[in-house]
Curated annotation (Swiss-Prot):
BP GO annotations: dITP catabolic process; dUMP biosynthetic process; dUTP catabolic process
Species for this entry: Schizosaccharomyces pombe (strain 972 / ATCC 24843)
Subunit comment: Homotrimer.
GO cellular component assignments: cytosol; nucleus
Protein name per its UniProtKB record: Probable deoxyuridine 5'-triphosphate nucleotidohydrolase
Reaction catalysed by this enzyme: dUTP + H2O = dUMP + diphosphate + H(+)
Presence of the UniProt keyword Metal-binding in the record: yes
Role: This enzyme is involved in nucleotide metabolism: it produces dUMP, the immediate precursor of thymidine nucleotides and it decreases the intracellular concentration of dUTP so that uracil cannot be incorporated into DNA.
Cofactor(s) required, per the database record: Mg(2+)
Keyword Metal-binding: yes
Pfam families: dUTPase
Binding positions (substrate): 62-64, 76-79, 130, 135-136
Taxonomy, superkingdom: Eukaryota
E.C. code: 3.6.1.23
Length: 140
């Protein structure tokens, strides 16, 4: 199984894996920008991708950026039929601006399988021990 990548500019970097067993492919910035403190920014990758049918690409944070700089990702779903420019939404939860340079690893792309069962309308759902008990109901 492969996925296809198109470079939209010379500044784009093809996704890479940190090791053979890495779950994700590193995504790289194609433009300089600042992730403002307590703010967000869309970072260009200058890539278009085609993930295999039956999968989607999930844009996930890089653990080092999250743990050392409080940088997180958001809105990170790339559908199998999307062919547009891939941008990464980064959030900065710290109190200092975070600079991004061309070629910086900014996120990771994880390919995940999709299950698409039919939606069935029912009058009520089958009862369970948990029932409708929500947040914190199974412990902290």
């Amino acid at each position: 199984m492969s996925f296809f990548v198109q470079k939209l500019s010379e500044k784009a970097t093809i996704p890479t894996k940190g090791s053979a067993n890495s779950a994700g492919y590193d995504l790289y910035a194609a433009a300089e920008c600042i992730v403002p403190r307590r703010g967000k920014v869309l970072v260009d990758t200058d890539l278009a991708i085609a993930v295999p049918e039956g999968t989607y690409g999930r844009v996930a944070p890089r653990s080092g950026l999250a743990s050392k700089h409080s940088i997180d990702t958001g809105a990170g779903v790339i559908d199998a039929d999307y062919r547009g420019h891939v941008r990464v939404l980064l959030f900065n939860y710290s109190d200092v601006d975070f600079p991004i340079k061309v070629g910086d690893r900014i996120a990771q792309l994880i390919l995940e399988r999709i299950v698409n069962p039919p939606v069935i309308l029912v009058e009520s759902l089958e009862a369970t021990v948990r029932g409708a008990n929500g947040f914190g109901s199974t412990g902290v």
